[in-house]
Amino acid sequence: MHHATPLITTIVGGLVLAFILGMLANKLRISPLVGYLLAGVLAGPFTPGFVADTKLAPELAELGVILLMFGVGLHFSLKDLMAVKAIAIPGAIAQIAVATLLGMALSAVLGWSLMTGIVFGLCLSTASTVVLLRALEERQLIDSQRGQIAIGWLIVEDLVMVLTLVLLPAVAGMMEQGDVGFATLAVDMGITIGKVIAFIAIMMLVGRRLVPWIMARSAATGSRELFTLSVLALALGVAFGAVELFDVSFALGAFFAGMVLNESELSHRAAHDTLPLRDAFAVLFFVSVGMLFDPLILIQQPLAVLATLAIILFGKSLAAFFLVRLFGHSQRTALTIAASLAQIGEFAFILAGLGMALNLLPQAGQNLVLAGAILSIMLNPVLFALLEKYLAKTETLEEQTLEEAIEEEKQIPVDICNHALLVGYGRVGSLLGEKLLASDIPLVVIETSRTRVDELRERGVRAVLGNAANEEIMQLAHLECAKWLILTIPNGYEAGEIVASARAKNPDIEIIARAHYDDEVAYITERGANQVVMGEREIARTMLELLETPPAGEVVTG
């Protein structure tokens, strides 16, 4: 189908189909990701009806990857990255090796050459950035120990894939034609590693000062549009520069841009302002993956598809599980990492495309990679759901490591009661929290920012890291015997869900919440809040009171 405006058609068609099928998936109690992928299949060239631009869609999806990784970087400090390097580096490399060997074994069964097997195996070895991060975000695990290990593991995988993409042409020439010597290969590898190190060094030394400075200057203008624009310009600009100047992936470039901004107080505002765009383009990523999938392969090569899927779901996951256990982490952590990595994504598509261009991977190989990606991404939410049920039935506190036990079970003294439970410690929450502390009211803070939680704990303030929508987090904060629940988070509808859950757990608790609009006030009140404060209304009321109060020292005549 010819489109006069392919960009607009692709965005509108992709988002509309994703919305419809995402809603249907949600209605059927399955992950919306499945709906987004099916939307891509319907919009792709292999099914009748509407066909989106298959060249534009992946580029739009890459924007989602950039913004998503930038957001992750905003919550991921260099200290966090260094804390997991001992397991992330050897673990990721070993897991890539296992997956590659399994892929080579399958390719040998299919009658492909050694080099084809290596490329095919590498395609099956690296997880999707978007899928992994979405899974962690949905379960509020980004800031947990498990989340930090998974993200560190992902970063190492991305670095290995960057090296692979640069070295593959030289290796292919050496193995297939014999005209590339080891010295040339070593030089290429040295240059690539040098570029990666140079990029990281520049971001740590120069970007660490320059990026926060630019953000501070844009914030000082008082223009929200300029601030949001500066966030997007930095995220996209650094990611693009990383690719063009250093041959580093878009995802890694954006990640380090976010990480150097992490130390700035503006990082949370930046994360909040880019959230809608991140979500929209992340959806387009899943749609673009679905567009590449030809459903006929499920009929033409069912056994090969099942074998490919088995390598992704079980081969690499079991390798990751045993490696994490080998490093002394709990079963919970090992299973979470294994489930997170039980899928493939962006780099698999890029590597498969390069393999096709170099005549190293047949069309059948690329089709198997795409089938494995689609099916593994669809099944990933199911794996996590099964994992959570299994852990709920079998895991005990004794099975966790001491470190995890402290983080997840002993954040709050067991004897605290009749306290104020404050959800959110941003601009509003911090002002309120300081007043409560000054009044000697027992206080527990629930906050999603690890940095803020660490700062509060250093001051001796009880703080729980996590999302208040999670019942386990509320249990840690002792909701059942709290006297007040105060919600200062800006999302009124999320606050309403928290209110309903809290009211069911503690019918007598006094609940005060924040809202921005009249419909949010009504919604939160219906869910069980005692009082809802709308910021704009309170500002107007206070200003009116000031107008009615005569200034000090001035005589009012009437």
Curated annotation (Swiss-Prot):
Binding site for AMP: 427-428, 447-448, 467-468, 494, 514
Keyword Membrane among record annotations: yes
Alphabetized Pfam families for the sequence: Na_H_Exchanger, TrkA_N
Superkingdom per UniProt: Bacteria
One GO MF term attached to the UniProt entry: monoatomic cation transmembrane transporter activity
Location of this chain's protein in the cell: Cell inner membrane
Residue ranges annotated for the RCK N-terminal domain, each copy included: 417-534
Membrane topology, from the record: Multi-pass membrane protein
Gene Ontology, cellular component aspect: plasma membrane
Residue intervals annotated with topology Periplasmic: 1-3, 53-55, 107-112, 170-185, 247, 301-303, 358-367
GO biological process, one term: proton transmembrane transport
Annotated keywords: Antiport, Cell inner membrane, Cell membrane, Ion transport, Membrane, Nucleotide-binding, Transmembrane, Transmembrane helix, Transport
Matches recorded under PANTHER family: CATION_PROTON ANTIPORTER YBAL-RELATED, SODIUM/HYDROGEN EXCHANGER FAMILY/TRKA DOMAIN PROTEIN
Family matches, as NCBIfam families: 2a37, PRK10669.1
The protein's name in its UniProt record: Putative cation/proton antiporter YbaL
UniProt source species: Escherichia coli (strain K12)
